[in-house]
A protein has these predicted regions:
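Asp-based, Mg2+/Mn2+-dependent phosphohydrolase catalytic module
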Residues: 1-6, 99, 108-210
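A generic short-segment signal for beta-strand/edge and adjacent turn/coil regions
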Residues: 33-37, 76-79, 101-102, 132-135, ...
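N-terminal helical cap/lid subdomain that shapes the substrate entry/recognition surface
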Residues: 2-96, 116-117
Length: 210
């Protein structure tokens, strides 16, 4: 009998924001400061203003190659990602939860991060997943809409009711998948929200799946 699918968001769900923040607010500003001869803090403020100008709803926002080109930093983006590998950090319960859940489910990863980012950030846990999906790299989309989850179902050859998704964004990881018929859980690590299908860590998720 085919296992059902358990789908995870990445940043804020499995991984903290440490790696992403280090790349965008330390690594890129450091390279920009060195290339253009400006103080680091000035470079960081300028780059942040440029990130805000483009906005997170544009696919290029998630593309490290785009920012290297835009800021005149060459093409050695892979070196920067590898340099900041020590900043990759998972929430404490993640390894054991993935190990246990992988016995009962096919694990899927769905993220807004570009594939270049995702491949580096998930390397230590990649073996738990049967498939990984980057909204930006694989579908050219930045929002996980109900229609997006429909595309995911079709690409997997699965019915919506065969997939459970969990993530930390109310709209993209909870409302949208439920809108297409998936079972979904909202992960609120702040503990501020309470209710059915709301969990505060992945240990609580595991108990809900039983």
């Amino acid at each position: 009998m085919q296992k059902k699918v358990l789908s995870f968001d990445l940043t804020g769900t499995l991984a903290t924001f440490s790696f992403c923040d280090a790349i965008y607010f330390e690594g890129l500003p450091r390279l920009y400061a060195a290339r253009h001869g400006v103080p680091f803090e000035e470079a960081r403020a300028y780059l942040k203003s440029q990130y805000d100008t483009l906005g997170e709803e544009i696919p290029e926002w998630y593309d490290i190659k785009y920012w290297f080109h835009r800021f005149g930093l060459g093409d050695r983006w892979g070196e920067l990602l590898r340099e900041y590998v020590p900043h990759i950090e998972y929430y404490p319960e993640v390894p054991r939860i993935l190990e246990r859940c992988s016995r009962e489910y096919e694990l899927l990863l769905i993220t807004n991060a570009s594939r270049e980012f995702m491949e580096i950030e998930t390397a230590p846990i990649r073996g738990y997943f049967t498939q990984t999906i980057s909204c930006v790299s694989d579908f050219g989309e930045v929002k996980k809409t109900s229609e997006f989850y429909g595309k995911v179902c079709r690409s997997l050859g699965r019915r919506p009711e065969e997939i459970t998704h969990v993530g930390d964004h109310w709209q993209f990881d909870f409302v949208a998948p439920r809108g297409h018929g998936l079972r979904a859980f909202y992960l609120d690590r702040t503990g501020e929200r309470l209710g059915e299908h709301i969990v505060h860590n992945l240990v609580e998720l595991e108990s809900q799946l039983i």
